[in-house]
Amino acid sequence: MLTRIFIRDKLVLSKIRKGKEMLKNIICIILAWLQTAGFSVLNYLKPNETQTIGVNKFVEHQIFEGFGTSSAWWSQTIDNEETAREIARLLYDDETGLGLDIYRYNIGGGEKENPATRIGDVNRRTESFYVLNEKTGKYEYDFTRDANARRMLDMAVEYGAKEVILFCNSPHFSMTESGQASGGLTEYASNLPKENYAAFVDYVLTIADWFVEQGYPVTAISPINEPQWKWGGDWVGQEGCHYSADETVAVLELFALEMQKRNSPYKLSGPESGQLSPEYYEYIDKFFASDILNEFCDTYSGHSYWIDNNLWVKTDVGNKFAEQYPEKKLEMSEWCELPLKIDSTAIDSGLYMANIIAQDLNLMNAVSWQSWTAVNGDGLMELINGELVIYNRYYAYKHFASFIKPGMARIDIMDSLKGESKVVSTAFTDGKETVLVLINNEETSQLIDLYGSYSSTEMYLTDEMNNCNKIYSGNFFRETTLPARSITTIVLTK
């Protein structure tokens, strides 16, 4: 049983005005008691108040499965091999990069070769493996295509990507009602006719099987992406396809049945809900109400858009899963700042992203977390005039991805000033190391008194002057300071 102890300083100090040392001793006794109960305790000391955070190693939440990013829509634009290799290193190398685990490869809908395309941005017109043989009039597979994107995938795997997820934003344009992969001619109408469901299933699985045969670590396919959005009509900014909740289930059930027949060595991921909030719970409920999907799928994937810093919604999502689907997992498969307003080079952007990651891990119990785009203005870095510019979001992401590894468990944190402090924290452990990520959103520095039994400590800092720099490595010590508006990762070893 866990016991909270709160120290109300005004009351205590009024009784022992002449005994500051006595107060210090009382606090130390309390901290020692908490430690014997399985807590590690952090005190955030601000003028006239004490914030006590207990990290309880005995209360575990989700087992983490990995961090990642997506290949869309930048990987096909990287023509220079040296640049591609540098990007792969920065993203996936454990020693000198982020050490990401997951690479999301986009199976494009073929708008690059579609003469009827209405997508204006050429970078959002994808090249497909599924091409028309003009001599026979039939579609065939050509896996030499999408060469730049495939090279980026090769390098990501070479540098350490352990999982590849193949995802579609739309079926191939030749299978759609409108003849375009950018959605239907009217809003909120599915662009995939029922008579083409089976063809779409075969198309995705054929491509996935080819990647598996080539030795890629394909762990999942994700054939549907953000089904609830209107996709089509007058707005055709990218590839996409609307599905109602019932249509989503019908398509994914066919995938599950065919994958069972083929004994596919990868999972079915879906439906990549474009927003996780109560008005779209119908998609979750109907997904798991399907006997086929409930048996075949252990995870529901969604995107963390449009609910940034909405703690109520994220808590509700986490509670819903814990209460209604206790045997299922939630993965956060896509996020970027929408709309992009914050200067990507400023600490503000790093703090913003770090807070979103912590919210999704703590409140929604996400078992994995993946950013939408790695190389773009709203991504982790950007290629400008041939030079890679590393954004502050990259360093914020590093505070999580380089230290919280697959297999680690998120552990409980007890906070005496929950809801009142601007210091956000999350904690993970593998039993030997405990990783604390501390985000100080305050305009002032925060003194920490870290009470625990550890042999060594490493600390990494991002603020106005540091970019996830190691600022300490050595014997464990109790007191340190979180600089104003900063992200600190503390690695504690028993």
PLM region spans:
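Aromatic/acidic polysaccharide-binding cleft in carbohydrate-active enzymes
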Residues: K329-S402, D412-S416
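Carbohydrate-binding surface patches
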Residues: S416-S455, R485
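N-terminal catalytic cores of secreted or lumenal carbohydrate-active enzymes
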Residues: T50-T219, P223, E239-Y243, V249, ...
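Conserved, mostly hydrophobic/aromatic
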Residues: T69, G99, V164, I221, ...
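Solvent-exposed beta-hairpin/edge-strand motifs
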Residues: G452-N467
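C-terminal beta-strand-rich structural cap/linker in extracellular carbohydrate-active enzymes
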Residues: S473-K494
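Short, positively charged and aromatic/hydrophobic N-terminal segments
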Residues: I5, K10-K15
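Active-site neighborhood of glycoside hydrolase catalytic domains
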Residues: D202-T206, W210-Q214, P227-W335
